[in-house]
Curated annotation (Swiss-Prot):
Biological source species: Arabidopsis thaliana
Function: Probably acts as a transcriptional activator. Binds to the GCC-box pathogenesis-related promoter element. May be involved in the regulation of gene expression by stress factors and by components of stress signal transduction pathways.
Name used for this protein in its record: Ethylene-responsive transcription factor ERF120
GO terms assigned for molecular function: DNA binding; DNA-binding transcription factor activity
Signal peptide: none
A biological-process GO annotation: ethylene-activated signaling pathway
GO CC terms: nucleus
């Protein structure tokens, strides 16, 4: 059985002042948090990132303007934050494969180009289809393979 002297009971008179102002509560909480963050009275083991932190009284953070801010100075892990490159007409399916679609201006519909194991392969399919549309459009205008019409006329005169 536990020693009843070590277990506080609810009927004991606890020294606490319920009539604190908000400012007084704020000062107490900030002081407690500063002690926890600065590890006052705790173990002496330190992590490598603790050396990069500014002291608590360093003034406002240059990024967020909060006094004593530690969130903005933590090193960012680029491997975790690494974003996937976005390609036009390419999206990732729930299965993990990459799908490519393109708008066909002549039919006024989306044309399905297929699914691919990588985003780069899907982007290549999109680029090939886009080049085909450009070639088709320029052929309608009387040019071949995207050549400028004015260039063709000047070469015929020579």
């Amino acid at each position: 059985m536990e020693n009843s002297e070590n277990v506080p009971s609810y009927d004991q008179n606890i020294n606490f002042t319920p009539n604190l102002t908000r400012d007084q509560e704020h000062v107490i909480m900030v002081s407690a948090l500063q002690q926890v963050i600065s590890n006052v009275g705790g173990d002496t083991n330190s992590n490598a990132w603790e050396a990069d932190l500014p002291p608590l009284n360093a003034g406002p953070c240059p990024l967020c303007s909060v006094t004593g801010c530690y969130g903005c100075v933590f090193p960012r892990h680029e491997a975790i934050i690494k974003k996937e490159k976005k390609h036009k007409g390419v999206r990732k399916k729930p299965s993990g494969k990459w799908a490519a679609e393109i708008w066909d201006p002549s039919l006024k519909v989306r044309r399905w180009l297929g699914t691919f194991p990588t985003a780069e392969m899907a982007a290549k399919a999109y680029n090939d289809a886009a080049a085909e549309f450009v070639g088709r459009r320029s052929a309608r205008r009387g040019t071949k393979n995207g050549e400028e019409a004015s260039t063709k006329k000047t070469t015929e005169k020579n």
